[in-house]
Amino acid sequence: YEAAYQAFVSKRGQIELNLREWMKPISLTPDNLHIGIHFLGENISAALQLGDISYVSGEVAWLKVLLKFHEAQPEQLIHFMKAYSEAVKQNINSQGKPISDWLTAEIEKLKAE
């Protein structure tokens, strides 16, 4: 996870910028979108440092609550996660594989709900 952590930290700003650009059409306010992006990034960074990306799964539950509170469609979280995965792939390529694999698994869980 060390390589993924280093790559994520060095490219996190660009990943989050891409994500904000791609997520403009959703029904969250820019502040709430920024909060979701920020805390997901913080949790990904911490989980990579701890050596287990699955620690971030609790963050997905929090994002679901945030979207529900703002009366957003559940599909928006799937869209958000796909966009995050794409931003990771685009900015850190194969070094981000643990992150994109985790995001893909979380997307599949969300689709199954």
Protein language model features and the residues they cover:
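Core of compact, soluble alpha-helical bundle domains
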Residues: Y1-K82, E86-E113
